[in-house]
């Protein structure tokens, strides 16, 4: 009888270990599929390689536009948009992330008024960067308004150095933005408070820089990712997959990127904003980065009696 009990216990233990092993493999496998698609680096500028601030077009891969409600309208606006009034002379610049040597970040600096403030532009992903029409148009709008700008490629994007096959959703990239700030202070003699920043889509992770650097005087967040686990859930739901896959995606993504993807949060900027102005804009029907990101950020700012303004746009996606 004792022999049979011992044999049964061994079988139960073996089954348990087998189940645990298979479950672990499945967890890692699911996480890898989710994370590798979500955070794979895609450096270079692709079809926009020839774009520069003084000579760019709105050309795009029109077939790649997803069938959102406003896609047709957006395509028509872009095809017929005259960019000639938004092309400006610029300076090629380079600098390193704050606290990290050996990584060169490359950007375009436009100065229209030596006495004006400056805005650092932070792009989204995947194949993205300073060369995309959206970023160049923003630089043109700022110049038209008499505001200087620095638009640059984060590490692993555009023409900046590649140090990994994966991006880290702001966990490392916020240091790139701090490097841009330091360059403006040291090389262009701006004073703290004269430098603002914008963050678009997945570039929202760089808002951590706003939390760390009180010299950044203002922040504009456009359809920004401010909660990485939430955006993974958003994307899984959009593609028709169970949202509980987000957990392994975040965990394995951290292993791939070499840093926990939840170590820092852009929501820290809402806690540390003080009286610095923050503007949030978001499409109410955004299927990729849900409006909940901006709403949560707004709520945090309000609870801290901070200076926040919002524009949530009806019938608009990402």
How would you describe each model-predicted region?
Residues 287-293:
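Conserved alpha/beta-hydrolase "acid-adjacent" motif
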Residues 273-274, 279-282, 286:
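Short beta-strand/loop motif that positions the catalytic acidic residue
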Residues 167-188:
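Alpha/beta-hydrolase active-site loop
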């Amino acid at each position: 009888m004792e022999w049979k009990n011992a044999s049964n216990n061994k079988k139960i233990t073996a089954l348990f270990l087998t189940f645990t092993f298979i479950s672990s493999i499945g967890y890692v496998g699911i996480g890898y599929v989710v994370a590798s698609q979500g955070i794979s680096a895609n450096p270079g500028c692709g079809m926009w390689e020839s774009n520069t601030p003084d000579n760019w077009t709105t050309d795009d891969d029109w077939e790649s536009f997803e069938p959102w409600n406003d896609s047709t309208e957006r395509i028509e606006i872009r095809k017929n948009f005259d960019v000639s009034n938004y092309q400006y002379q610029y300076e090629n610049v380079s600098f390193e992330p704050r606290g990290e040597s050996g990584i060169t970040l490359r950007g375009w600096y436009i100065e229209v008024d030596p006495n004006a403030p400056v805005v650092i532009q932070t792009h989204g992903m995947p194949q993205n960067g300073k060369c995309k029409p959206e970023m160049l148009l923003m630089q043109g709008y700022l110049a038209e308004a008499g505001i200087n700008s620095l638009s640059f490629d984060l590490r692993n994007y555009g023409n900046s150095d590649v140090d990994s096959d994966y991006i880290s959703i702001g966990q490392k990239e916020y240091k790139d933005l701090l490097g841009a700030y330091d360059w403006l202070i040291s090389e262009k003699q701006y004073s703290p408070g004269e430098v603002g920043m914008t963050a678009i889509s997945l570039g929202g992770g760089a808002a951590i820089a706003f939390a760390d650097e009180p010299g950044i005087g203002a922040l504009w967040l456009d359809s920004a990712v401010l909660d990485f686990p939430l955006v993974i859930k958003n994307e899984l739901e959009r593609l028709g997959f169970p949202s509980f896959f987000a957990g392994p995606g975040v965990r394995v993504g951290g292993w791939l990127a070499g840093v926990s993807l939840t170590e820092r949060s852009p929501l820290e900027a809402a806690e540390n904003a003080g009286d610095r102005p923050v503007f949030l804009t978001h499409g109410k029907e955004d299927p990729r980065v849900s409006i909940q990101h901006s709403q949560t950020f707004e709520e945090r700012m309000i609870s801290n009696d901070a200076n926040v303004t919002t524009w949530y746009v009806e019938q608009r996606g990402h």
